[in-house]
Amino acid sequence: MKTLIVSGGNVGKEILNKTIKNNNFNNIIAVDKGLEILDECKIQPNYIIGDFDSVNQKIISKYNEERTIKLNPEKDFTDTHMAIKLAIEKKSDYIVVLGGIGTRIDHTIANVHILKECIENKIRCEIIN
């Protein structure tokens, strides 16, 4: 199973559309602000996860709460880390993360570090910036 995780970093329409076109994703997970670019491109995520501190509330209100996972803003992990855990739980064997690097150094370091969790679970994972 292939999963695309769209995080809150800088993701352009071109790279998003190219990544989707070149892969046959079974699941798309929007992470907090990552929902905005998916919404702009009219791409429906299967899951939305985050503490929703950075996404436009008008956008998130358009989506089904049934597939929305709201996280506590006071936590010891990033929203993207929880998206990786969700992808692993859904039996993904290939995970692509868009927008996981660049905007915040603490999140960049954490997101690179969570690749270890994929390796430990024998899951192919890549971060595309």
Question: What feature does the model see in each segment?
Answer:
Residues 69, 95-100:
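Short glycine-rich or small-residue beta-strand-to-loop segments that form or flank ligand, phosphate
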Residues 106-116:
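Short Gly/Thr/Asp-enriched flexible loops that form oxyanion-binding sites at enzyme active sites
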